Structure formats: C-alpha cells, structure tokens
C-alpha cells in the first residue's frame, strides 16, 4: 500500500513539472487526492498508529502488514520499476521532491510510533496447551510479556485460561463502561473450543485484548488488570516458598518482580516488598547471600523514610545479618533497627522475612 502511495505521489509531482501532459478526463473524474483522503489515508493512519484489528488471517495476513511497513521504512528503488513506470518517471527535480516526501513520510511514521503509540507492553501467545483435569478440560495460554529493555532479556511470562480473561473483561466492563465499550473480546463457543483454528484465533484475540487495555491509561492502572498479571504468580511463589521448594519459588518471584517492573504502575502497596522478601528468602536458602542482601537493600530503598512499615524491621534485620556475613558495612541498618526497637515499634528480635511470607494473605 505504501509503495502504491509513493507511486501516485511521484506522478502527482511529475504532473506539475514542465513538459508533462495535462490530466485526462478520467483523472479529473477520479482525482488521486480524493483516493488518498478517502481510502489510503485512513489505512495509512491506522498502520502508523499501530491500531490492532480482530480480522482473521485470511482477511489481513501478517505478511502484508510487514510488507507495508517495510515500504514506509525503505522507499522502493528505481531498479525494480517496470517499463511503464520508467516512461512516466519524473524529471530530476521531481525525483528529489519525491525522495523528500518519502523521507517526510518516514519521519512521520517514526514520530507516530513515539507519540500516537507510547511505549507499552507487547504480548505474544507462545504456547497453548489443552489441559485435561477431570471432570474439566480447558486450554492454557502462555503469553510472553515484553517491555522496553535489552533485547536479550528473557521476557516475563504468564499462563492463563479463557475463564481468567473472561473474568478480567467482565470486571473491567462493570467498572469502566466507556473505555471498555470500544474493546472487543472473543465470545464463548458451545462447540469446537479445542480445534486448532479456535485456539489460534483466540490467541490472537487475547494478544490484542491485552494490548488495547495497556493503551488506555485509565485501564492500564486498574487494580483488576494488575491482579490479572501479578496475583496468581505471587500466590504460587508464596506456596512454593512455604513448602521449602526454594529453587522453583525463586523463578516465580523473579518473574513476578519483572512483571511489576514492566507494568510500571503499583500492583498494590505491599506487593513489591513482598516480592523482594520472597527473593531474599530464596536466595538466602540457596546459599546466595550477595543476592539476598541486594534484595534487602532494594526493599529498604523502596521503604525510604516513610512511617514504620511491617516489613521495615525484618528487612533491616536481614540486611544487618547478611552484611555481617559478607563483611560489609552494617552500621546504618543496625542503628535504624535499634531505634525502632527502643521506640517499641518492633519486637526484639523482629520477625523474619520468612515468617512474614507465611503469614501474609494475598487477596
């Protein structure tokens, strides 16, 4: 589409140049400007803004999308032009104008990606498995959650079933009728729920559904959306930690921390601290005191100078103990912990991070 657009613009520029014949009756009846405004401009703006559609693969193949975007990135060279194009090629001034216009289109496209579509998360269904858990049977969709950062960084992942997505959609519809009215969601089916075609279409629909939610600030900050991403991971990580499966729990805590970092909005006042507590406990139990201390230090930075928090004394105690074990300075944390104890704001000794994890109720 972009190549056709540039092709028409070249002829429009050429027609203004000297020695070019006047446009015939057919050109007057169907001026190129009207075609551009009515058809191509709308399609171009939708592609530039990154708008997602729920069209099927037959109607809107991914290959065509990639070709169109490539056409905007790299204008077609004259080597590939047909004989007819060569006969109608504009004079050098027209070529320069066309190249300038192509550069302007590229700049507009790049600017549109930065302004119309702010940096946000991308979602990709990497696998979809049919799970048989008698008497129920369902499809478990695993999504990669990708955000800004080093390209070699492993993306965070979540695994959800249709009922999880449906519950999120229903809750958001109840709270945000206006914004949600423009967001589509795949309907329930009475039959053929486990065919490859249905699973593929739903996978694409779920990717777009989450992408649209992330594009609306009001929805992006909704507690229900935060819970959808983070809460199941935290519950599983907490359960594994309490049963002593620290290596398995560590992977879930790390994934939950990455999700919260990428979401960029608070997923609850205590959840980042709880996640850091889980990471610190698992690293400590797996004989990695350096990482455990780093997690405690990060938590103390998050707590800052706020009023005493239930997690403050346990993190201070862990930081003092780990610093002593590593031969690092512990005086500041030690003095702060002693001040809390003298003020009667915590017990002596304070509860451990593991005790807090066991007692914490995630809802």
Swiss-Prot record:
Residues 57-71 have a biased composition (Acidic residues). The keyword Protein transport applies. Residues 1-99 are annotated as: Disordered. Pfam families: PX (PF00787). One of its GO terms (biological process) is protein transport. Residues 119-236 form the PX domain. Its main location: membrane. Belongs to the sorting nexin family. This is Sorting nexin-21. It comes from Mus musculus (Mouse). The lineage of its organism: Eukaryota, Metazoa, Chordata, Craniata, Vertebrata. The gene is Snx21.
């Amino acid at each position: 589409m972009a190549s056709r657009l540039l092709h028409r613009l070249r002829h429009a520029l050429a027609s203004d140049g000297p020695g070019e014949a006047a446009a015939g009756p057919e050109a007057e009846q169907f001026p190129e400007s009207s075609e551009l405004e009515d058809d191509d401009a709308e399609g171009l703006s939708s592609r530039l803004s990154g708008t997602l559609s729920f069209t099927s693969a037959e109607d809107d193949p991914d290959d065509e999308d990639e070709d169109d975007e490539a056409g905007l990135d790299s204008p077609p060279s004259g080597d590939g032009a047909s004989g007819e194009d060569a006969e109608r090629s504009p004079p050098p001034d027209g070529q320069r104008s066309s190249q300038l216009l192509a550069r302007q289109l590229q700049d507009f496209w790049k600017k549109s990606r930065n302004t119309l579509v702010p940096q946000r998360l991308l979602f990709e269904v990497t696998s979809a498995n049919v799970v048989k858990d008698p008497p129920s049977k369902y499809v478990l969709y695993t999504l990669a959650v990708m955000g800004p950062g080093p390209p070699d960084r492993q993306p965070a992942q979540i695994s959800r079933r249709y009922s999880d997505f449906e519950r999120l959609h229903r809750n958001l519809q109840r709270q945000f009728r206006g914004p949600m009215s423009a967001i589509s969601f795949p309907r329930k089916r009475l039959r053929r729920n486990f065919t490859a075609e249905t699973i593929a279409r739903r996978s694409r629909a779920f990717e777009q559904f989450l992408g649209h939610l992330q594009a609306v600030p009001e929805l992006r900050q909704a507690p229900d959306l935060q819970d959808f991403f983070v809460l199941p991971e935290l519950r599983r990580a907490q359960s594994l930690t309490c049963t002593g499966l620290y290596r398995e729990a560590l992977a879930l805590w790390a994934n939950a921390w990455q999700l919260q970092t990428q979401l960029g909005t608070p997923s609850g006042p205590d959840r980042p601290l709880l996640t850091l507590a889980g990471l610190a406990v698992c690293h400590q139990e797996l004989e990695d005191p350096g990482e455990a201390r780093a997690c405690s230090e990060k938590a103390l930075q998050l707590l800052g100078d706020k009023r005493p928090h239930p997690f403050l004394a346990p993190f201070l105690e862990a930081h003092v103990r780990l610093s002593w074990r590593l031969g690092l300075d512990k005086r500041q944390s030690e003095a702060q912990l002693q001040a809390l104890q003298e003020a009667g704001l915590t017990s002596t000794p304070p509860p451990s991070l593991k005790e807090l994890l066991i007692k914490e109720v995630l809802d």
